[in-house]
Amino acid sequence: MDFSNKIGFLGVYFNKFTIKSLVALILGFRGRYITVVTPNVDHIVRLNSNLDFKKLYQQADITVNDSRILNLLSKIAHVDIGDVIPGSDLTRKLIENLPCNDYPISVIGASDETIKFVSDKYNLTYLHHYNPPMGFIDDAIEVNKCIDFVLNNPSKIIFICVGSPRQEI
């Protein structure tokens, strides 16, 4: 699938999706994997001052705008970067539209309480969770634990919820 149709704004190239079309694409995707990022204004500032961070965003298959402020700026500049799709809204819509409650999902980050709440609310039976300790990104052993967790828990969706910029690295 070709996701190369992107619109550049402030050094980032955005795909234009509605939340409905993006959820359908993700849940219907049959390829190996796709990477979706949802930058907000803080991310834009950071990636324009950090080349390594910017490369990570450039490598993402799909980039959608997470920020109403960014949306307003794009309108002022007469650049249509698509709908505002906050990562939290996308996550909720994905879970609400899962084809079955045993759809394999993995989550890195978030508290045990949050995972239990989501699992109970949506009756998810195949939800794997690992919450690395604070500062894990500077500890090769902990980073490898995250990688091993993903490899040992095959899932159709993997949510990385450890905060920027750690989740991008």
Show the residue positions of the predicted features:
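Periplasmic-binding protein-like
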Residues: 156-162
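Structural motif
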Residues: 39-42, 108-112, 163
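Conserved beta-alpha
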Residues: 71-149, 153
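Loop/helix-junction capping segments adjacent to catalytic residues or to phosphate/diphosphate-binding pockets
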Residues: 47, 137-140, 165-168
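N-terminal nucleotide/polyanion-binding subdomain common to many enzyme families
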Residues: 1-91
